[in-house]
Amino acid sequence: MPLCDPGERQPGGSPVRIGALAPLTRPGWAEAGRHLLAGLELAVRDVNDAGGIVGRPLELVVRDTAADPRRAATAVDELAGLGVAAVAGEYHSVVARAAAVRADALGLPFLCSSAVLDALTEQPTPWVARLAPPQSRGWRLYADFLLSEGHSRIAVATEPSVYWASGARVLRDRLAPYGGTVVELDMRALTPAAVCDELADHRATALLLLVGHPEPAVPIVESVRRDRRLAGMTIGAPAGQPEFAGWATSLGEDGAGIPFLRYLPERLTPLGARVGTSLRERLAEAPSFVAFEGYDTVAVLAGVLRSSGADRTRTAASWPCVAVEGTRGPIRFSRVPGISVWQWGGAPIQVVDRDPAQPGRFRVLRTG
């Protein structure tokens, strides 16, 4: 049974510490990590300005995962030894999975901010919760978008990864009943120019980038855009690479008109609007959905910690009791079939792209 009643609380005293995981250096997607950390830090500031955790200041203990699962698992061990009340964050799915497995083994609450891989743990766990929607939900919506645009012959440029393989499987399973096919192009064996040859040979109408950014995503886009045989070819990036300013800086107009997934609602909540303004000031650029995920993560944990007294067991038992007004809507966790962690079932999903006429502006193409 969940422990939804407040535990014994002791006002004042030493800081309540939360471990924060984020990719802050290469080969991690450091731009995403910077946005995630900005959201986490802003929320901590707001929590402390409002009195902290029953008078105790909230403090982040940040660790750079650098897209390395082993480094993430080691960080979770270290943070547990430092006495953190919970661990939060992470962007890369495979890294988050390593962190989740270790947190589960240690009995340490982990609120995953951004990673979408369905199977964060092999077995159901009471210790882990997640804000981002599972990959199966988001990528099915993306497949539906492709079908609505008339695409049935899809090519995916892919690299070895559980995350990319899982995404390709979701796409294939969703497209197959409608006669759609998915051809995988192994980027270990192909140059960007060779990708263009494969696309022409397979008569694909859409190429999806299931690869890292900037390499090899950027040179693939540049090659496809310049190949006359592929005029009109749709390029897609379901993992969200075009969300960040670095994409536009690298590709300019070539990076526009590439649909991707992001996790924002049509309208932010009043809290979200205020937070968005503060994040823009902090980042000196428009905040991505990842920054809002970071903020919501701390907002949820602060509410849980106020009632649990920073006790790890009570914190984990409180996931089903969460009722927080986040930046993107009301947040509650439930058990979702096929998902091993506590899941926010109402996380918003959009398919968007950068407007070719104005690459700094996003167009919403589909919601779900």
Which role fits each region the language model picked out?
Residues M1-G368:
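Extracytosolic ligand-binding ectodomains
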